[in-house]
């Protein structure tokens, strides 16, 4: 998956 802000 991908995480970020």
Swiss-Prot record:
Listed GO CC annotations: extracellular region; immunoglobulin complex; plasma membrane
Assembly and interaction partners: Immunoglobulins are composed of two identical heavy chains and two identical light chains; disulfide-linked.
Lineage, uppermost ranks: Eukaryota, Metazoa, Chordata, Craniata, Vertebrata
UniProtKB keywords: Adaptive immunity, Cell membrane, Immunity, Immunoglobulin, Immunoglobulin domain, Membrane, Secreted
Subcellular location: Secreted; Cell membrane
Protein's UniProt name: Immunoglobulin heavy diversity 1-1
Role noted for this protein: D region of the variable domain of immunoglobulin heavy chains that participates in the antigen recognition. Immunoglobulins, also known as antibodies, are membrane-bound or secreted glycoproteins produced by B lymphocytes. In the recognition phase of humoral immunity, the membrane-bound immunoglobulins serve as receptors which, upon binding of a specific antigen, trigger the clonal expansion and differentiation of B lymphocytes into immunoglobulins-secreting plasma cells.
Organism the protein comes from: Homo sapiens
GO biological processes: adaptive immune response
